[in-house]
Amino acid sequence: MVSKTWICGFISIITVVQALSCEKHDVLKKYQVGKFSSLTSTERDTPPSTTIEKWWINVCEEHTVEPPEDCKKNDMLCGLTDVILPGKDAITTQIIDFDKNIGFNVEETESALTLTLKGATWGANSFDAKLEFQCNDNMKQDELTSHTWADKSIQLTLKGPSGCLKSKDDDKKNGDGDNGKDGDNEGKKPAKKAGGTLWFTWLFLYALLFTLIYLMVVSFLNTRGGSFQDFRAEFIQRSTQFLTSLPEFCREVVSRILGRSTAQRGGYSAV
């Protein structure tokens, strides 16, 4: 019995942590519920008064917005009941709230995304709430289509964008999936140029290193048995000769290549 209670408590703690961020929840992160909050109200004639029920819903911490008066800042769901008598100001008679530190369950079906909040304390009683989000892409805000409050259970049905899956554009912004293939290909084109430049740089460095090693080896062989000063003088002399002869060597190579090309073109012209 003790172990079962401990396990249930541990699961509840994990659930509480996940409840704070929809983007970290495997199911909620697929939906637009993290983008919206809603404040809906219904009005009933209760002679001699008028009763107004308000419901504030802000499931995800990603959407930061101030709640209405009498609701707490960390409420996921808050219900207010106001009673208005003729000629008098409204009186708030009921406040029930479900904050982000309570347990929850998430269920997705073909018709709706359902979020069940568990164990909100209201006086001496404990209540659960079931929020059903139905998708409607044509609506800019969620609207409350039905609500019931009975037997320590509250059920609200909302229709609007919160119950809709995120679009491909949202996935591209978040870097999810393979939807950004075109953008990736465009980003790879400059990488090819950078790769060619990098290859040439490495080739130049290898050639420079090979030349340096060659000059050092030749200088060492020519001054073997001598002092370091002899080696240094030999190395400087050979390096200087190499640098001074390099331009002439390059010109000779270029002239030979161009001369061969000219000879080939001349041969073709003669034919």
From Swiss-Prot:
Disulfide bonds join C22-C60, C71-C78, C135-C164. Residues 219-271 are cytoplasmic. Residues 161-190 are annotated as: Disordered. It is a single-pass type I membrane protein; Single-pass membrane protein. It comes from the Eukaryota. Residues 20-197 are lumenal. One of its GO terms (cellular component) is mitochondrial membrane. Its main location: membrane. Residues 20-166 form the MRH domain. One of its GO terms (biological process) is protein transport. Residues 1-19 form the signal peptide. Keywords: Autophagy, Cytoplasmic vesicle, Disulfide bond, Golgi apparatus, Membrane, Mitochondrion, Protein transport, Signal, Transmembrane, Transmembrane helix, Transport. Residues 166-189 have a biased composition (Basic and acidic residues). It is found in: Cytoplasmic vesicle membrane; Golgi apparatus membrane; Mitochondrion membrane; Preautophagosomal structure membrane. Effector of VPS34 phosphatidylinositol 3-phosphate kinase signaling. Regulates the cytoplasm to vacuole transport (Cvt) vesicle formation. Plays a role in ATG protein retrieval from the pre-autophagosomal structure (PAS) and is especially required for autophagy-dependent cycling of ATG9. Forms a complex with ATG9 and ATG23. Belongs to the ATG27 family. This is Autophagy-related protein 27.
